[in-house]
């Protein structure tokens, strides 16, 4: 006698995430976005409140180099939201997220970096920068970059020049300059300055990208 046993199993069906969270990391003093690093830089961490406890594994998203963020894969619910990056630690925010939610984090960056680029000779561009040591931290590195694409930071560049630091790092505001040479005429290049103040996460602060 042949007995055939048939067993059926059902797959749990979960609805896809339909909510989103977007916003910006904003300098508390200047009210401008805090420039960042697109990958392995500032991150937004979302811990969901589920079954009467906070999740252990966060829903992470990177902050763009212009200081904005957008996570479009969020389940509707209650979250504890943190921002980690090159700024003084900020308190987490608890909120309900549903639909298209917007929020900003106001922070005090370790360093404020401004930069400008000028070209007086063919094939040469001089980048000047001012580094404001907002929190009086030890500055470990100041770097000039240029890249052939708009995405430029300490990990993504065509060329990099590191500053030889001296006692000027003890100043509240220090200025530096570097001239990039042998740049092809008629091509578009993108310039940026990054600097590292001592911090546990090894996060860099940046200037805006200059085209």
Describe the predicted segments one by one.
Residues 67-69, 101-103, 172-178:
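Short strand-edge motifs at loop-to-beta-strand transitions and within beta-strands
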Residues 180-204:
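Beta-strand-rich modules
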Residues 85-110:
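Structured interaction patches on ligand/partner-binding surfaces of diverse proteins
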Residues 55-59, 145-182:
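Recognizes extended acidic, P/S/T-rich segments that occur
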């Amino acid at each position: 006698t042949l007995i055939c046993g048939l067993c059926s199993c059902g797959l749990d069906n979960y609805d896809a995430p339909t909510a989103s969270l977007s916003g910006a990391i904003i300098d508390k003093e200047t009210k401008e976005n805090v420039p960042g690093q697109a990958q392995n830089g500032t991150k937004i961490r979302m811990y969901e409140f589920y079954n009467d406890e906070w999740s252990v594994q966060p829903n992470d998203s990177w902050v763009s180099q212009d200081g904005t963020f957008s996570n479009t894969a969020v389940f509707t619910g209650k979250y504890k939201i943190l921002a980690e990056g090159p700024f003084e630690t900020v308190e987490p925010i608890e909120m309900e997220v549903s639909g298209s939610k917007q929020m900003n984090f106001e922070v005090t960056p370790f360093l404020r970096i401004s930069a400008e680029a000028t070209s007086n000779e063919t094939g040469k561009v001089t980048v000047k920068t001012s580094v404001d040591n907002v929190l009086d931290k030890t500055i470990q590195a100041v770097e000039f970059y240029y890249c052939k694409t708009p995405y430029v930071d300490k990990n993504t560049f065509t060329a990099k020049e590191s500053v030889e630091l001296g006692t000027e790092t003890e100043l509240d505001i220090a200025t530096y300059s570097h001239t990039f040479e042998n740049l092809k005429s008629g091509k578009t290049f993108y310039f940026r300055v990054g600097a590292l103040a001592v911090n546990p996460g090894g996060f860099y602060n940046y200037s805006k990208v200059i085209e």
